[in-house]
A protein has these predicted regions:
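Short helix-loop-beta junction
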Residues: 55-62, 277-293, 540-546
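Short acidic, glycine/serine/threonine-rich loops at helix termini
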Residues: 52-56, 82-85, 105-109, 132-141, ...
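Flexible, low-complexity linker and terminal segments
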Residues: 2-26, 30, 156-409, 414-415, ...
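Thiamine diphosphate
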Residues: 1-159, 187, 257-260, 265, 445-579, 587-592, ...
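A glycine-rich helix N-cap at a beta->alpha junction
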Residues: 61-72, 115-127, 206-213, 499-512, ...
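Intrinsic disorder at enzyme termini
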Residues: 604-618, 668-716
């Protein structure tokens, strides 16, 4: 169950010629694919492009009507390998995944695809997970474009430009027999807007038809001597064809004055930021009209040399706004100017940050510095300074005004008790060498658990601990999620451990979904999926690959059992890897699934019991060990109105979802017995209501009796 449903929104994909589409960026990309006559689509979920996969899943009926093959691939490599269908056949295909980690995984298939070239249009839609909101290492997709000679599109972040980029991408790919990457930044994926639609097109050749008439071209296979010819073909044929297409179709855009003393070159994705900075300087109006010449690179690779030189003609200085590092575009343009003996002064990273996302303030400051140096007459006196001060001051004070809030597990997360159990084991036995993996469980490396020190790639947690299997007083422990397990972990981590007779402990955290990417189904998901095969146990897979010591914990909230199973894995004399599969459903997905049903049941007048937990103020000792071992967001502190008790007690707020982890932790760690469970009954029966009234009456009598026996002191 994905975190977001597009069942209603996908109906917009049926819009016909001349109708207006209003919606989100990823939905617009899907509509553009259908308008282009795509024959097959695939991909692997991952922010910021996860919702594109969710849209495709919810649009399967529409895809089937158009004879479009859709596949939710096991990994980015599997997705990219799908594009092999466009090598010999004139079929348009598109795949999607996040970048750069997705491209890292897909790089082998991507390089082979680029070497042999394509006949049909091949488009890779990458979500550039860079800057604020990113969850990965900060790198750029540009390196892969230049390494494998794949054309890179970076459209202006508005729906008409994005839709046009999809259309241009397919045509550019076919014109140059080269795959194309379409880069969408985080905000571009979710930008809202409108565009005029065209009719959806069935593929001119479907994959079904192609299967009935197989084709092969030996010279397209990446095998010597053909692979040597591929490299020469890239330079002599494909590159010139791409440059001519970009130039003739005017994929890059020029705005502002036709001539001027200075100019600004930017990636298409930076256009909005540059225009906003110009507006703040009084050099552009609300509609983006400006007198500053702008050269917008909707295609950032390859560059069109004569086009760039024409833009530079008559200018004394040009600013390159290129987000991230290295400065691929700026360096390439500097080389172009050098070869052309140009006299233009090129500026970029000297006035803009070398690395990191270019927020509005960065672009404003860089543009201001550039203008002050090369065209001070264009800079209104005092404009930038008057606008900068409040922003700078508020930024400096922000860390003082807002407390640090590191990411953590969700309330009720079934992975929290796993780390509580592991922390108890470490408190008893000393620190363990723990390797983490990509996924929600990586939050265990932060407070209050602070377990795990590395993450080397999706599904590579156990493999990253391989060097520590050489003995020692404690066995190494590796943590991997079910999503990472099926993505890469079964072979690269568990299979590797079996083959090398690893003595380590592999802890597979199974929450029934690829939860961190949005709750998509995986092979071991328990839900029935009409188009996918689910219900394949992880334990069966690890046994099938050769692991012998395998234990299952089917309720991670049972902290004592979880702790004891970990101890058993650390103590056993069995040779080979010790695998623990700890399973409980992701609380977010469980709430999405159960809450509508519960609300309907309550509305229908039926009896529903909801568990809630609390802390007895009189019993709580105030040492807060429960908070340190649990870290649940629902656990907070409460100051008592009691002069004899200085320390605040633990308190459970209304965000509690009733998972019971707090009580289980207190019981397993033998803490104070202050936690209690209270059942909230909706639509109780007559007997329950009567018992409730009698109970309240009895409690009132006892409280009044107690009050009479309390000593009182009269003021003197």
């Amino acid at each position: 169950m994905a975190e977001r449903s597009f069942k209603q929104e996908v109906e917009k994909l049926r819009l016909g010629p001349g109708e207006e589409f209003r919606g989100e960026g990823i939905l617009a990309v899907t509509k553009a694919l259908l308008q282009c006559g795509v024959g097959y689509v695939g991909g692997y979920q991952g922010a910021p492009i996860s919702h594109l996969m969710d849209v495709l899943v919810d649009a399967q009926d529409i895809l089937e009507e158009l004879d479009v093959r859709f596949e939710a691939n096991a990994s980015e490599a599997a997705a990219c390998a799908m594009l092999a269908a466009s090598v010999h056949y004139p079929i348009r295909g598109a795949v999607t995944f996040k970048a750069p980690v997705g491209i890292n995984v897909a790089s082998d298939a991507l390089a082979n695809l680029s070497s042999g070239g394509v006949t049909g249009g091949a488009l890779v839609v990458v979500g550039e997970d860079y800057g604020e909101g990113s969850s990965i290492m900060q790198e750029r997709s540009h390196a892969y474009a230049t390494k494998s000679q794949i054309w890179l599109l970076d459209p202006r972040p508005n729906l008409p430009s994005i839709v046009k980029a999809v259309e241009d991408g397919f045509e550019l790919s076919e014109a140059s027999n080269t795959p194309v990457m379409l880069e969408l930044r985080i905000r571009a994926c979710h930008v809202y807007g409108s565009f005029m639609t065209k009719a959806n097109r069935r593929p001119t050749l479907s994959v079904t038809q192609a299967l009935n008439e197989p084709k092969r071209q030996t010279d397209r296979i990446v095998l010597p001597p053909a692979s040597y010819a591929h490299e020469q073909e890239k330079i002599s044929q494909r590159w010139p064809a791409a440059v001519e297409f970009i130039r003739s179709r005017q994929l890059n855009e020029v705005f502002g004055a036709a001539s001027g003393k200075i100019g600004v070159v930017m990636q298409g994705g930076m256009y909005n930021g540059v225009i906003r900075a110009l507006q703040r300087l009084g050099l552009a109006d609300l509609y983006g009209e400006t007198r500053i010449p702008l050269y917008v690179l909707n295609v950032t690779y390859p560059l069109v040399e004569d086009e760039f030189l024409a833009f530079c003609k008559g200018k004394s200085a040009v600013l390159v706004v290129e987000e991230g590092q290295p400065a691929y575009i700026e360096d390439a343009m500097a080389a172009i100017l050098y070869r052309a003996r140009g006299s233009v002064q090129l500026s970029g990273k000297d006035v803009l940050p070398m690395a990191g996302e270019y927020i509005g303030q960065h672009v404003l400051e860089g543009l201001t510095a550039f203008l002050a140096r090369h065209a001070p007459e264009e800079l209104p006196a005092g404009t930038a300074q008057s606008q900068d001060k409040p922003i700078a001051e508020s930024g400096n004070n922000l860390s003082d005004a807002v407390p640090v809030r590191p990411p953590s597990f969700c309330t009720g997360c079934p992975e929290r008790p796993v780390f509580s159990a592991l922390k108890m084991v470490q408190q008893e036995r000393g620190s363990l060498q723990v390797a983490g993996d990509i996924g929600c469980h990586l939050f265990g490396s932060l407070a209050p658990f602070e377990i795990g020190g590395t993450t080397m790639g999706y599904g590579l947690g156990p493999a990253s601990n391989a060097a520590f299997d050489g003995g020692g007083s404690q066995r190494p422990v590796s943590i991997i999620g079910d999503g990472g397990f099926w993505h890469n972990g079964l072979t690269s981590s568990v299979g590797n451990a079996v083959f090398n007779k690893s003595d380590g402990v592999v802890l597979v955290v199974d929450n029934f979904y690829s939860a961190a990417t949005g709750g998509q189904d995986v092979l071991s998901s328990r839900a029935e999926n009409r188009s996918k095969s689910t219900g394949h146990p992880i334990s069966a897979a690890v046994k099938g690959i050769g692991a012998e010591w395998v234990r299952e914990v089917n309720d991670t909230y049972d902290v004592a059992t979880m702790r004891d199973t970990l101890k058993a894995a650390l103590d056993t004399d069995h040779e080979g890897p010790k695998v623990i599969v700890a399973s409980s459903e992701c609380m977010l997905n469980r709430q999405r699934r159960e809450r509508p049903v519960v609300n309907q049941t309550i509305a229908a007048g039926e009896r529903v019991v909801k568990p809630r937990f609390g802390v007895d103020d009189d019993v709580c000792t105030g040492d807060h060990a429960c908070i340190r071992l649990s870290g649940c967001p629902s656990l907070s502190l409460k100051i008592l109105d009691d002069p004899l008790r200085d320390d605040p007690v633990a308190h459970i707020d209304q965000s509690c979802v009733g998972c019971g982890n707090c009580g289980e932790v207190a019981d397993a760690a033998v803490l104070c017995p202050s936690f209690y469970r209270a059942d909230v009954v909706h639509n109780p029966g007559w007997f329950e209501r009567l018992r409730h009234r009698l109970t309240l009456g009895l409690i009132g009598i006892l409280q009044r009796r107690r009050s009479r026996r309390v000593l009182g002191f009269e003021p003197v």
